[in-house]
Amino acid sequence: MSSYQQEFARAVAVQNIEYLRRAYAKATDLIGLADQESVQAGRQIYHRIFSADTEFTISGEGTDAMRASGPDGWVDVVAEALAPLGPTQHLIGTQLVEILSLDLDANGSPHSGQAQMESYVQAWHEMGDGQVWLFLGTYFDEISFYPEAGWQIDKMVLHRVAGEN
């Protein structure tokens, strides 16, 4: 396999990994709508982008530390946190992916891999009193490639940087 093919495979991997966080933002906003159909749609996305045993942590000044395991555990945390609020919009900014390993088959398709990703988030939350609560944070993810599922997040840490309302 040529070095060009290897670099192409790495570029595709980076793009696929970045899209995990973008899909997460969409799923989280759906769950925040708090109706059964939207929560189920968000849950389906979470099951696609997270491995079955993903570990989740939220930390940072002014934030209650939270932990959960697995996509369904995280749906419960998100639904409880966002249900009292109005609509939300999670905007994903700067994304940096580092491919730690990427093993390709003879056709140039991945069959295993490890990566890390850092992503900025601005999350806007409508409050019941017409105010908007702004959460600024950084996601730190550990990601693996699974032949049956593709790239999935195995560990997610959300660290709050700042916020206001």
Name every feature range the model reports, one short phrase each:
Residues 1-48:
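Short, low-complexity N-terminal intrinsically disordered segments enriched in polar/charged residues
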